[in-house]
């Protein structure tokens, strides 16, 4: 696991704890979505690499966010930006948002699974995979289907950090690894 992901998870967990304590998860989700969207802008990212002091960088970022959404950013949200700028972590905002969203889905007993296949799956095939995963995870499952011709055949299922690889490409790779050892 990369160190950036670990750091982003730490921020996401801290923000999630505040959101649960304040009973305002949706508000924080929309704030982090805004911060993430703004931080993905090329011009804003170029600010992150300039030699600006953290307070100045935070103020500029917050001003951009306020201008974008046409309303003030609250004090708690500003403090998150100040802390992340102080530690040179503003580039992690999209990852923090993704991890926060994952924590929210766990909190409401819903999990998103990514189903990757070589060809588009039919509705009944997706439903069968979704039902099996919902039973296995004991949660409501939101499937996201993607097509990747490189896997040759079969299905890959991703649930957070867990990967279930039932693809031909994965089997060939594992067979090759066994034969070489």
Curated annotation (Swiss-Prot):
<protein>
    <recommendedName>
        <fullName>ATP synthase subunit delta</fullName>
    </recommendedName>
</protein>
<keyword id="KW-0066">ATP synthesis</keyword>
<keyword id="KW-0997">Cell inner membrane</keyword>
<dbReference type="GO" id="GO:0046933">
    <property type="term" value="F:proton-transporting ATP synthase activity, rotational mechanism"/>
</dbReference>
<comment type="subunit">
    <text>F-type ATPases have 2 components, F(1) - the catalytic core - and F(0) - the membrane proton channel. F(1) has five subunits: alpha(3), beta(3), gamma(1), delta(1), epsilon(1). F(0) has three main subunits: a(1), b(2) and c(10-14). The alpha and beta chains form an alternating ring which encloses part of the gamma chain. F(1) is attached to F(0) by a central stalk formed by the gamma and epsilon chains, while a peripheral stalk is formed by the delta and b chains.</text>
</comment>
<keyword id="KW-0375">Hydrogen ion transport</keyword>
<comment type="function">
    <text>F(1)F(0) ATP synthase produces ATP from ADP in the presence of a proton or sodium gradient. F-type ATPases consist of two structural domains, F(1) containing the extramembraneous catalytic core and F(0) containing the membrane proton channel, linked together by a central stalk and a peripheral stalk. During catalysis, ATP synthesis in the catalytic domain of F(1) is coupled via a rotary mechanism of the central stalk subunits to proton translocation.</text>
</comment>
<dbReference type="GO" id="GO:0045259">
    <property type="term" value="C:proton-transporting ATP synthase complex"/>
</dbReference>
<dbReference type="GO" id="GO:0005886">
    <property type="term" value="C:plasma membrane"/>
</dbReference>
<keyword id="KW-0139">CF(1)</keyword>
<keyword id="KW-0813">Transport</keyword>
<keyword id="KW-1003">Cell membrane</keyword>
<keyword id="KW-0472">Membrane</keyword>
<dbReference type="InterPro" id="IPR026015">
    <property type="entry name" value="ATP_synth_OSCP/delta_N_sf"/>
</dbReference>
<keyword id="KW-0406">Ion transport</keyword>
<comment type="similarity">
    <text>Belongs to the ATPase delta chain family.</text>
</comment>
<dbReference type="Pfam" id="PF00213">
    <property type="entry name" value="OSCP"/>
</dbReference>
<dbReference type="InterPro" id="IPR000711">
    <property type="entry name" value="ATPase_OSCP/dsu"/>
</dbReference>
<comment type="function">
    <text>This protein is part of the stalk that links CF(0) to CF(1). It either transmits conformational changes from CF(0) to CF(1) or is implicated in proton conduction.</text>
</comment>
């Amino acid at each position: 696991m990369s160190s950036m992901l670990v750091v982003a998870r730490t921020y996401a967990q801290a923000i999630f704890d505040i959101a649960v304590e304040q009973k305002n998860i949706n508000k924080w989700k929309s704030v982090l979505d805004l911060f993430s969207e703004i931080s993905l802008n090329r011009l804003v990212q170029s600010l992150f690499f300039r030699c600006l002091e953290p307070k100045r960088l935070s103020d500029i970022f917050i001003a951009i966010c306020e201008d974008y959404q046409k309303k003030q950013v609250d004090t708690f949200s500003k403090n998150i930006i100040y802390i992340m700028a102080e530690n040179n972590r503003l580039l992690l905002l999209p990852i923090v948002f993704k991890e926060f969203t994952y924590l929210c889905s766990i909190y409401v007993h819903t999990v998103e699974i990514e189903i990757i296949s070589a060809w588009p799956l039919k509705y009944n095939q997706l439903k069968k995979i979704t039902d099996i995963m919902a039973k296995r995870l004991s949660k409501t499952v939101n499937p996201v289907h993607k097509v990747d011709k490189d896997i040759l055949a079969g299905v890959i299922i991703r649930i957070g950090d867990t990967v279930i690889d039932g693809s031909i490409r994965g089997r060939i790779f594992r067979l090759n690894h066994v034969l070489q050892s």
